[in-house]
UniProtKB/Swiss-Prot annotation:
The matrix-open state (m-state) is inhibited by the membrane-permeable bongkrekic acid (BKA). The cytoplasmic-open state (c-state) is inhibited by the membrane-impermeable toxic inhibitor carboxyatractyloside (CATR). It comes from Neurospora crassa (strain ATCC 24698 / 74-OR23-1A / CBS 708.71 / DSM 1257 / FGSC 987). The transmembrane helices are not perpendicular to the plane of the membrane, but cross the membrane at an angle. Odd-numbered transmembrane helices exhibit a sharp kink, due to the presence of a conserved proline residue. It is found in: Mitochondrion inner membrane. Its main location: mitochondrion. One of its GO terms (cellular component) is mitochondrial inner membrane. This is ADP,ATP carrier protein.
Amino acid sequence: MAEQQKVLGMPPFVADFLMGGVSAAVSKTAAAPIERIKLLVQNQDEMIRAGRLDRRYNGIIDCFKRTTADEGVMALWRGNTANVIRYFPTQALNFAFRDKFKKMFGYKKDVDGYWKWMAGNLASGGAAGATSLLFVYSLDYARTRLANDAKSAKKGGERQFNGLVDVYRKTIASDGIAGLYRGFGPSVAGIVVYRGLYFGLYDSIKPVLLVGDLKNNFLASFALGWCVTTAAGIASYPLDTIRRRMMMTSGEAVKYKSSFDAASQIVAKEGVKSLFKGAGANILRGVAGAGVLSIYDQLQVLLFGKAFKGGSG
């Protein structure tokens, strides 16, 4: 077999991995301010309970104003480093496990039928997601804690953590390794729910809407993909809220006993709508990330003749 042509002087898979990382870093860094606002709004009740926030945010705009006023504009990128670093081990693990899980659960839609294919897709996605999460979950935990580490008005403007390493050090000291994995269960459930809804909705709607001239229309496909992504994201958002609220209790005296206990307490004390706090910012983040990535893809095509795709999430 002929040797594959090198890209940027490197083997193709190495170039894809590294340049994909640059794409991910650009996308995540561009959307980081919206991501931090989303996390602050989403987890504000845990911050109030821990005495790290004096009053609730009155929506996304109020959170943005107060955060920039109290901490400065650059604080909007707090926690972004951990989020960017997380891309590389996640992608490496995806390369390692992707083929293995595809062989285990790889049904073909036209041969085995839609439902077998869908079940295999959910099983492989859930298994691959859970396996990757085992290795990178602590980085997502650290990112969440740093992003929600607002300068406490009640505690003289002090932060709880002094950077990424400090999050690990303090969490392990107070809660052990288990503290870094709080909320792991709902995270895996969220992957399965999201994938199930995404593929289920996309496969159901595409043959109905994308017909005739729209069948191979890029904008129509992009719009449908974005709508389905948004719908799946909103539907699985409560699981994201539950896992992050559980993360926020590491190092605190009172913790949720389980994901069910967390959901029950949140709904009982704050109402169902609390499970969707920050969902609006999450949609904006998706738009910002996709927009920047589209522009960056075009630049890569101009410079290198191809676009290198970065990971999401």
